[in-house]
Curated annotation (Swiss-Prot):
Compartments where located: Cell membrane
The EC number(s) this enzyme carries: 2.7.1.-
Xref: NCBIfam families: EIIB_glc, PTBA, PTS-II-BC-glcB
Protein name: PTS system glucosamine-specific EIICBA component
UniProt entry keywords in alphabetical sequence: Cell membrane, Kinase, Membrane, Phosphoprotein, Phosphotransferase system, Sugar transport, Transferase, Transmembrane, Transmembrane helix, Transport
One BP term from GO: phosphoenolpyruvate-dependent sugar phosphotransferase system
Domain notes: The EIIC domain type-1 forms the PTS system translocation channel and contains the specific substrate-binding site. The PTS EIIB type-1 domain is phosphorylated by phospho-EIIA on a cysteinyl residue. Then, it transfers the phosphoryl group to the sugar substrate concomitantly with the sugar uptake processed by the PTS EIIC type-1 domain.
Phosphohistidine PTM sites in chain numbering: H567
Recorded catalytic activity of this chain's protein: D-glucosamine(out) + N(pros)-phospho-L-histidyl-[protein] = D-glucosamine 6-phosphate(in) + L-histidyl-[protein]
Gene: gamP
Principal location listed in the UniProt entry: membrane
Length: 631
């Protein structure tokens, strides 16, 4: 049950990042257009309209995020939210309810929570009914067209139900808001719990009600009422920003101090290497407020430090509150947001002295703990720890392929997504995931909870996810078996080896392949062949590493350690093995020229995107490829 609950919360957490991602752009427009900066109302209003419609944006964002980017789910969410809103208004009149506050636009206002509910509903109904087949008479409304229809009806029902339930929930939220707003202890626990949830990626769920629902403020100039700490702050509420202000000293001063402590306690021979990594991580935290590169450098090797870190983060919020500091952000508590939004802050200058004091506390406390308890923070590992291996020499455009290998290959991926700083993956077989390889490829940390993995690759995580999905869509085999060959064999091929072309035909460059996975060399260097016959033979003596289930691709390892992928045709994975016959099995030793695979060339030309066959040397650089002898 815990496994399933964690997976659902993970999915919701990453889905919430879709609408949250638009806030920095809206915040920039809102601030630059404000009176204390450019004083251009048209720019300010362009940003303000996003904040005014946050519930609708959350509805669409959550729906699309949970439905795998499907626009139909987003359309259904728009329709569903509009129906929910009007249903709540009409039910409020029937029930004789009074406006929740003076000037309220709606008698029952669920705010962002209503948008999230509709987003969840639209995504669920999309997954449930997007393939439905209706009676031929109603055939036009089958499949995806049915989703907005069923969402409309369901939203009406949800609206009726919540017209009775939501007023009670709203009273509870208001009571909790008042309690926490007046409680320093409550603020401490908020900040500490928020920080403790970050390793699990569940903090997005935790902060949402605080940022977008708790507390209310009526703009005296417009009469508009907004709720939530973040939205109130940007509407000009001088009391807002209480649940954000402590992040500024933590991210701008304290985490860089942690990075410095890690550098100073590293082994002498490793300080230069560790300095480069930690200084980069510290600057990322200082400027943008992205904390994972620093936090995950010590989280897994010294969990006790992260507990201390989280408690101190709570103390920072308390101290800032005692000095009546109020400051906010649209992205995170880094230096950019600090400077940009300073004009809206109250006692924002206090962040600097508080940050400096706590930076000293963090530095000396972390330094003492690392040395006293001999914690294996970066740069302090011994050779026996197995953590001193250099990161795999993988070209940037090939990283996605190797990460997919480390995750156990395409067949092992049940769900793949990403947020700002981490890949979020659900796998079928956790034992096939190589966490050490993920770290060698650049992940600063890997979190495993049952079948769910989070690999912290920083801000490139989302682009990395897209590259992996592109590779998976092309049906490229990346298996755990292939991974073993990467780690156990030499990375450079034997220069004395001589290869033969695995297929007869015209040799062309990878740039001629009509698939960007190959043409952009995401998987490695090589060439392509336009086949003249349907036979694939072993290019050298070696071993069959893997055969894709649909038999359209073979992973091969030569006796000298050269990895070769032979991918027959483009989009041939969609043929489901039709027209292919394998003559070898995974793990089988073969001789140069031995028949590996036969395929119906005419069938592939008729049913696939192209018969052109990429031959990829997956562990060979462009320079090394020049020395490979082909005949």
């Amino acid at each position: 049950m815990f496994k399933k609950a964690f997976q659902i919360l993970q999915q919701l957490g990453r889905a919430l990042m879709t609408p949250v991602a638009v806030l920095p752009a809206a915040g920039l427009l809102l601030r630059f257009g404000d009176k204390d900066l450019l004083n251009i109302p048209i720019i300010k209003d362009a940003g303000g309209v996003v904040f005014d419609n946050l519930p609708l944006i959350f509805a669409v964002g959550v729906a699309i995020g949970l439905a795998g980017g499907e626009g139909v789910a987003g359309l259904a969410a728009v329709i569903g939210y509009l129906i929910l809103t009007v249903t709540l208004d009409n039910m409020g009149k029937l029930l004789g309810l009074q406006p929740p506050y003076e000037g309220a636009e709606h008698l029952i206002d669920m705010g962002v929570f209503g948008g999230i509910i509709i987003g969840l509903l639209a995504a669920y109904l999309y997954k449930r009914f997007s393939s439905i087949e209706l009676h031929p008479v109603l055939g036009f409304f089958s499949g995806k067209r049915f989703v907005p229809i069923i969402t409309s009806v369901s939203s009406l029902v949800i609206g009726v139900i919540f017209s009775f339930v939501w007023p009670l929930i709203q009273n509870g939220i208001n009571a909790a808001s008042s309690l926490i707003a007046d409680s320093t202890v409550g603020l401490f626990f908020y900040a500490t719990i928020y920080r403790l949830l970050i390793p699990f990626g569940l903090h997005h769920i935790f902060y949402t009600p605080f940022y977008f629902m708790m507390g209310e403020y009526t703009d005296p100039s417009t009469g508009n009422t907004v709720t939530g700490d973040l939205t109130r702050f940007f509407a000009g509420d001088p009391t807002a920003g209480r649940f954000m202000m402590g992040d500024f000293p933590y991210m701008i001063f304290c985490l860089p101090a942690v990075a410095l402590a890690i550098i100073h306690t590293a082994r002498p021979e490793k300080k230069k290497m560790i300095s480069g990594v930690m200084i980069s991580a510290a600057l990322t935290s200082m400027l943008t407020g992205i904390t994972e590169p620093v936090e995950f450098s010590f989280l897994f090797v010294a969990p006790v430090l992260y507990l201390i870190n989280s408690i101190l983060a709570g103390v920072i919020f308390v101290v800032c509150d005692l000095f009546h500091v109020r400051h906010g952000y649209t992205f995170s508590g880094g230096g950019i947001d600090y400077v940009l939004n300073y004009g809206l802050s109250t006692n924002g200058w206090v962040v600097i002295p508080v940050g400096i004091v706590f930076a000293f506390i963090y530095y000396y406390l972390f330094r003492f703990a690392i040395l006293k308890w001999n914690l294996k923070t970066p740069g302090r590992e011994t050779d026996e720890d197995g953590q001193n291996e250099e990161k795999a020499p993988v070209a940037k455009d090939q990283l996605a392929f190797h990460v997919l290998q480390a995750l156990g290959g395409q067949q092992n991926i049940a769900n793949l997504d990403a947020c700002i700083t981490r890949l979020r993956v659900t796998v079928h077989q956790p034992s096939q995931v190589c966490k050490d390889e993920l770290k060698r490829l650049g992940a600063v940390g890997v979190l495993e909870v049952n079948n769910n993995f989070q690999a912290i690759f920083g801000t490139k995580s989302d682009a990395l996810k897209d590259d992996i999905k592109t590779i998976m869509a092309g049906g490229v085999p990346a298996t755990a078996a292939a991974l073993d060959t990467v780690t156990d064999k030499p990375l450079k091929p034997d220069s004395d080896e001589t290869f033969i072309y695995p297929i007869k035909g015209e040799t062309v460059s990878l740039g001629d392949v009509p698939d960007q996975v190959f043409s952009e060399k995401m998987m490695g260097e090589g060439f392509a062949i336009i086949p003249s016959e349907g036979k694939v033979v072993a290019p050298a003596d070696g071993e069959i590493v893997s055969i894709f289930p649909t038999k359209h691709a073979i992973g091969f390892m030569s006796a000298g350690g050269t990895e070769i992928l032979i991918h027959v045709g483009i989009d041939t994975v969609k043929l489901n093995g039709e027209g292919f016959e394998a003559h070898v099995t995974s793990g089988q030793a073969v001789k140069q020229g031995e028949l590996l695979l036969t395929f119906d060339l005419n069938y592939i030309k008729q049913h696939a995107a192209s018969a052109i066959t990429p031959v990829i040397f997956t562990n060979t650089s462009e320079e090394d490829l020049k020395h490979i002898q082909m005949k």
